Amino acid sequence: MYRAVTRQIEVTVEPNFVPEQSSADRSRYFWSYTIVITNSGEETVQLKTRHWIITDASGRQQEVKGEGVVGEQPILGPGERFEYTSGVPLSTASGFMTGRYQMVTESGERFEIDVPAFSLDSPDSKRVLN
């Protein structure tokens, strides 16, 4: 599990390779990832936008920006959490993702929180030590 905390908001990510939606012969690899956002602060916040950078094993990057996550802009009161699962395809057997969410407080203050960089590894990927 991958974890980042910004302004008392914790984001955890758990990626999972999905073999039944992947085909090495067609250079298609698919992962699901489950994200849990927990508000440990004292203010109610709302997730407004997402910004992802997805990088495959060849170094190709894809940038994804949009409103909310999975069609929602969740509101998190103090102590509340929001969990969702989404997915990502790549044409290589491994890669990684990183990102940010834009949040807004009840008073209208906007700020960004980090989504931890997380690895997308399939059984076909070769381990590389940097």
Set out the residue ranges of the language-model regions.
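Low-complexity, acidic Ser/Thr/Pro/Gly-rich terminal tails and inter-domain linkers that flank the onset
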Residues: M1-S27
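Short beta-strand segments
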Residues: I9, V45, Q62, E109-I113
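Short glycine/serine/proline-enriched coil/turn segments at secondary-structure junctions
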Residues: S23, T44, S91-G95
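Short, solvent-exposed loop/turn segments enriched in Ser/Thr/Gly
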Residues: R28-T34, M97-T98
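Short acidic, flexible loop segments centered on an aromatic residue
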Residues: E43-Q62, M103
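Intrinsically disordered, low-complexity Pro/Gly/Ser/Thr-rich segments with frequent PxxP/GP/PP motifs
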Residues: Q62-S94
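Terminal connector regions
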Residues: P89-N130
